[in-house]
């Protein structure tokens, strides 16, 4: 599973750890991805890796929850 949002395409960025003595070492900033079940307009349901920004903006439609009898 790649560290990339399936909706907006957001992926890891490169930056630095900066120590007290100002020594810089490489690091990665990973997006906050969540696994979410998404329902397409034709009724198909798939699991997507979605960043929290897309979740909050409503870019993903969650399927209706069925009640178990």
UniProtKB/Swiss-Prot annotation:
GO terms for molecular function: structural constituent of ribosome. Coiled coil: none annotated. Gene3D superfamilies: Ribosomal protein L28/L24. Keywords: Ribonucleoprotein, Ribosomal protein. One of its GO terms (biological process) is translation. It holds the Pfam family Ribosomal_L28. GO terms for cellular component: ribonucleoprotein complex; ribosome. SUPFAM superfamilies: L28p-like. NCBIfam families: L28 (TIGR00009). Belongs to the bacterial ribosomal protein bL28 family. PANTHER family: 50S RIBOSOMAL PROTEIN L28 (PTHR39080), LARGE RIBOSOMAL SUBUNIT PROTEIN BL28A (PTHR39080:SF1). This is Large ribosomal subunit protein bL28. The lineage of its organism: Bacteria, Pseudomonadati, Thermodesulfobacteriota, Desulfovibrionia, Desulfovibrionales. The gene is rpmB.
């Amino acid at each position: 599973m790649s560290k990339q949002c399936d909706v907006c395409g957001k992926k890891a960025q490169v930056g630095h750890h900066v120590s007290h003595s100002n020594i810089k070492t490489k690091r990665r900033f990973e997006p906050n991805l969540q696994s979410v079940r998404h329902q397409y307009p034709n009724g198909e349901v798939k699991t997507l890796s979605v960043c929290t920004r897309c979740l909050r903006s409503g870019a993903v439609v969650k399927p209706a929850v069925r009640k178990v009898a």
